[in-house]
Amino acid sequence: MAKLKEGDMLAIHSYKHDGKIHRSWDEATYIGENDEYTIFGNNKTLVTESDGRTWKTKEPAIMYFSKKSWFNIIGQLKESGIYYYCNIASPFVIEENTIKYIDYDLDLRVFPDGSFKILDRGEYQYHKKIMHYSKDIDQILKSELSILINHVRNHDFPFCEKQIKENYENYVKIKKEKIKK
């Protein structure tokens, strides 16, 4: 992967196990990284579904792409608090100015009070069958979901309000500097 610079803008492409595009986002602005995550932000960005439908995100989001684990985390800064949408997904790659990963259906929704809900189990079972997920993949995905739940329960990075707000402030600063140029 090429070395990213603060403020670099990339697209995001989410694929399914069969290689077909699932969803794409027009914008992700590089904020920085640490040992565990590469961090991006966006706000009111255009999203295109596999069937061609489009919509825009409603609020700012800080996205954490894990360098070591099979998940990515989207922190949504809503008026009612910070919500997290966590995708169980393959490790990401960056090619042609695009973040790419395979979405494996299972999602974890985390609410501002720290409670959470596992989403899309039925979709996971359906795709596991028709796309022939291997036993190894199935085991990895279930293990990664457990790890993710433990991160939520322990308030590990990035499930920390202070940290996501700092990342958001940095995102706003980067966007303002880009406008000045």
Predicted stretch roles:
Residues 1-60:
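Charge-rich, low-complexity N-terminal segments
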Residues 15-17, 33, 45, 68, ...:
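Generic structural motif
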Residues 22-26, 57-59, 68-72, 101-105:
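Short, surface-exposed coil-to-beta transition loops
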Residues 49-94:
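The feature represents the first ordered module of a protein
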Residues 79-135:
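Conserved, surface-exposed functional patches that form binding/active-site neighborhoods
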Residues 94, 137-139, 160, 180:
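Juxtamembrane/interface motifs at transmembrane-helix termini
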Residues 118, 127-154:
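A contiguous, mid-protein "functional segment" used to position or interact
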Residues 145-181:
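Cysteine/selenocysteine-centered motifs that mediate thiol-based redox chemistry or coordinate metal-sulfur cofactors
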